[in-house]
Each structure stands twice: as C-alpha cells, then as structure tokens.
Design a protein with these regions (language model features):
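A short acidic, glycine-rich active-site loop
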Residues: 82-92
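N-terminal secretory/targeting leader peptides
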Residues: 1-84, 99-312
C-alpha cells in the first residue's frame, strides 16, 4: 500500500489501519505500508498498471487526475468530522464518491477523519480583506480557489517545501494541515500569527483506494476485515488528532505564537467567494454537481445541524 501521507499523524493512521487488518484477518491477509513510492498525480496509473496494490491518502490528493475528488477531502465551510462522517456513512456521500471513482475503475473506503485544519500561518496580522490582496500563500484545493477570488496568490507546495518558502520570503503565509502537524514542519517558527478556525477544511478524510477488480477479487472474510479495520481507524484517528490538537495549541501559546480568530469581515467574504467557486466547479462536472446536491440535501435533512453551526 502506497502511503501519500507524509506528516506523522496521517502516516500513523495508515500503519494503524494495516495492523488492524492483519489482526482481524488473523494473519491471513497483510498490508505492507510504503511511504510515497508513487506521487499523488501518478497514483491512478500505478494502480492500473499493478505497480502498487492500494493507496492510503485522501481523495483530494488526486485532484489533478479528477478535480471532482477534492470535495471529498473536506471543503470550505463544510461539516465538522462528525457531520462529514454522517454524510459519508448515511447521507449519500459514499455513493457520490463511488460514482466519481467508478469512471476510473477504482474503489474507495472511508477509513479515517481528522478535525479542522488551522486557518493559516501569517508573517504579519491579517485584519481586513484588503490585507489578502496580492498575498503569496501556500494553499490547497478549494481553499486555494476561494482565497484566489479575494486576491491571494496561492502556491501548492509539498510539505517539505513550505518552511523554506516562508524563510526565503517566496510566500508570506501558509495553510497546510492540523496545527499539531504544522508544528512538526516548524511553521510556527517562520510565521508567528495563527488564524482559526480552519474554514477551508473543517474535516479531513482518510481513505483506502484500490482498483475495483482488486476489491472484487478479495474473499468475503478479507473484505470484512478491511471494513472493520476502517471503522476502528476512523475512531482512532479522530481521537488521536483531537488530543494532539489541544497539546499543539497550548505549546504555540507558550512559545509566543499569536493565535487569532478570523475577523468576521474576512470570513463573510470567504463564504461568499466559496459559494461562487463551488457553483462554477459544479457547473463543469455533473458528478460533482450531484455530490454537492447530495451534501446540501443531507444538511437540510439534519435541520439546525448545519455546516454554519461549526464555523460560527
């Protein structure tokens, strides 16, 4: 299994999943985890060619091969981990994702979820929408498209390149992942202003991805072991991430990092921009449009338990 998730917690979740599979299959089925044997953009081809058997990652990693997948990694002003899991498990999210992966002959299983990312690390305070205009910032996916609408110049940099880019002044801000994972990269040492919440990704999903033919070829017992391991890893990943999140924020404050809430003016502008971005993206792809309608329908069915409840 090729793991695309370099930062510690992401990779640990993949190893935890593999160990759970072996335990539940009583040693009759094992998964060997390899770190980034194949890069994100090469995963589909490597799976098709049989160079790798499976991928551990998040659907958004494959946005270059299918932009519609980005929404399944978590999206701006979306649900928290509980809400995202409810959509994926019971609200039609898994079926919408299956439809997108089916056009590539792939099968995905929802195996983990992490809490909100940080909203971004900045070298100077951000107080108004005007402060974002022309700002060079590491950003990813739909968050990057939304920021671009407000004048930000987004750079999609891999984890190892973010700190050097801040140090050299190539970028003046960065959003990457959970604060606990950002700490491992030393982002707080290069940009001392952290803004919360992570509006761009209130939840991050983790998945197992393999060819449909490989999933079909597994025995019922081995499929059951994998599904049970996914359930176990889902609980483990969220609990572990939340514990580390609290510790990381306490550490940042002790080290003098300025932790700020986003100004309401900026959040309101970002929300408006996101509404326009997702409308434009959905208009280009019928399956993405169906996925978005699935999510909106799920939110409506939940009454007051909306995405806004989490951000606000």
């Amino acid at each position: 299994m090729n793991s695309l998730l370099y930062p510690k917690l992401f990779g640990e979740a993949g190893s935890h999943f593999a160990a759970e599979v072996e335990r539940r299959a009583r040693g009759s089925f094992t998964i060997e985890v390899q770190d980034r044997m194949v890069l994100d953009q090469d995963s589909f081809g490597a799976l098709e060619a049989g160079l790798i058997d499976a991928v551990w990652g998040s659907a958004g990693h494959h946005h270059r091969e299918d932009p519609a997948l980005a929404i399944f990694s978590g999206f701006p002003f979306g649900p928290d981990p509980d809400g995202f899991t409810a959509w994926m498990r019971e609200g039609g999210g898994a079926e919408a994702l299956d439809a997108i992966y089916a056009r590539h002959g792939l099968k995905s299983l929802y195996c983990g979820v992490l809490p909100a990312e940080g909203g971004g690390w900045f070298r100077a305070p951000v107080e108004t929408v005007a402060d974002l205009d022309g700002l060079a910032m590491r950003a990813f996916g739909y968050g990057a498209l939304t920021l671009r609408a407000l004048g930000v110049v987004p750079y999609e940099l891999p984890a190892a390149d973010i700190r050097p880019a801040l140090d050299t002044g190539l970028i003046a801000a960065a959003e990457f992942s959970l604060p606990s994972i950002d700490a491992d990269l030393g982002l707080h040492e290069a940009a001392g202003y952290l803004y919360l919440p992570g509006w761009q990704q209130p939840a991050t999903s983790l998945e197992l991805l393999m060819p449909e033919r490989s999933w079909a070829a597994l025995s019922d017992d081995h499929r059951s072991a994998i599904e049970a391991a996914c359930e176990a890893t889902l609980s483990w990943s969220l609990a572990m991430a939340r514990e580390r999140q609290v510790a990381a924020l306490e550490r940042f404050r002790a080290e003098g990092v300025m932790v700020h809430d986003w100004p309401e003016e900026i959040l309101a502008a970002l929300r408006r921009a996101w509404t326009e971005v997702i409308a434009e993206e959905a208009a280009r792809d019928a399956l993405l449009a169906a996925a978005w309608e699935s999510y909106l329908g799920h939110v409506e069915s939940q009454g007051s338990a909306t995405a806004q409840d989490y951000i606000d």
